[in-house]
C-alpha cells in the first residue's frame, strides 16, 4: 500500500524529548515499512523517521500557532491528491475534515480526550469519519458521542530498546506533563506522606508554567523532591530503570498513557488511579497497582518490591510491540479499502 501519514507540526517526528503522538507515529512508520509498505510522512522538515518525508515547515512551530497545523494539513491534502496514494492516516484532530476533500479514504486516530468541548466542536461535524481509538475506554467515550469507531488499536513502543532493571532505586518517579489533571502535585503529596524520595521529569510548557510555579516549585528541595527536567529517550529509560516505581496519578480519562508501558518495559511497576485506560494496562498486583485514592497509593508503595521486573518487561513485549500495532493498522487500512471497493 501507498500510505500517507499526517503528523503534527509542533514537534519533530520522532521528538527529541516530549511528544508521545509523534513517537508512536515513528514506530508505526517503521512497522509499516518493515511490512513492505510505501510510507510518506507529513511532518516538520527536521523529522528523522525513516520514510519519504514531505514538509511545509522546516522546524516545529513554537510558540504554538493553531493556523500552522491547518496550513500543514491543507497542503498535505493537495499533495496527497496529486500523488496517487491508497489511504491516508491522519493524527491531527483539527484535520479530520480532510476526509471530504481527499480523493482516497482516510483513517483518523483519536489521541486525545474526545469529550472535551473543543474536540466535540470539531467531531460533531464529522461523526461518520473512520476513527481508531487507542483504548477501550476512549472507544466507549467516542461511540457515546456518536463517532464511527472502526477499531481499537493500543499504542506501542520499541521494546527491543528496553531491558528490565536488575537493581531498582530508592525513589518514586513521575514522568509527564505538568498540568493539574496529570497529577504531579499528587505525586508530591504521596512522597511527603510516605517519606519516599520523588524525582519528577517532564516538560513545563507555557500553559503549565503557572501551575508548576505554584504547585510544584515550592516543594522542590533537591533532596527528597527533585525536578530533573525534560529528558531524551536514553535519559528517560535510565530515569525509569533506576526508580523503585512510577506514579501515574492522572485524574482524567487518559486515552492511553505511554509512560505506563515505558516504565513496565524497564521492569518497573506503576501505580495509577482507575481512570481512562489505566485499568486496561495495569494488571493489579502483577505489574503495578490500581489505587482508589491517595491513601491507597501511599499504601501500595510498600508493595512495589513484590512486583517482578521480568514479568513487567515481558508483559509489554507480548502486548505492546510495534509489529502488533503495525499489523492491526494494516488490517484496518485493508478493511477500509475493501469496503470502498
What are these regions (language model features)?
Residues 1-341:
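Catalytic cores of nucleotide-sugar-dependent glycosyltransferases that transfer UDP/GDP/TDP-activated
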